[in-house]
Curated annotation (Swiss-Prot):
This is DNA repair protein RecO. Belongs to the RecO family. InterPro entries: ARFGAP/RecO, DNA_rep/recomb_RecO_N, NA-bd_OB-fold, RecO, RecO_C. Gene3D superfamilies: Nucleic acid-binding proteins, Recombination protein O, C-terminal domain. Disulfide bonds: none annotated. Keywords: DNA damage, DNA recombination, DNA repair.
Amino acid sequence: MEGWQRAFVLHSRPWSETSLMLDVFTEESGRVRLVAKGARSKRSNLKGALQPFTPLLLRYSGRGEVKTLRSAEAVSLALPLSGITLYSGLYINELLSRVLEYETRFSELFFDYLNCIQALAGTTGSPEPALRRFELALLGHLGYGVNFTHCAGSGERVDDTMTYRYREEKGFFASVVIDNNTFTGRHLKALDAREFPDVDTLRAAKRFTRMALKPYLGGKPLKSRELFRQFMPKRTVKTKKD
């Protein structure tokens, strides 16, 4: 890919005394693995640019699994994430690194990622709504289509007061039993609208995305999720009534 394209660094690690191995998410090529030669040297002007959450323009070349970074420029300063929003950003970076195949184009997902990072940088409240919206967008781009508005058993529209059980790859079915795999019709409508007006709907959204992402993540836990759990205060979510 000789042309310039927009990108973000998801993760980097030392590759040699002077080079970095980068996992980047690009607009045109999706996730790409790059070697940034000389990026660790004291004279390199890339060192400050090749950081997570910094909007980049870059060019690379190569035919193998690992490409060679040719040029990179920071479009702007890194989006200002700190504290809980920084952990949230690290979480979505790790999520993309775990679920996306290399060199598969996800142009719309790239903009969902950018919107999520910008929302995290601009929030003064809980990062949870932005995270849930991004997870739902990611599931959609992965082909995980779910009908939140109709009962999979009867075909009727969901009722706010009824309870529905989620069955993987099948949808939501009316249920008389309430447990961790069930959701109210109100929850499902909130998921469909990507709007979470209170703690209850936000928790329901988190339960659903955890369930839906599990097949993609396998049994290996996310490192960033554990860090997030340790950092997250017991109550960070503010409802519209607060």
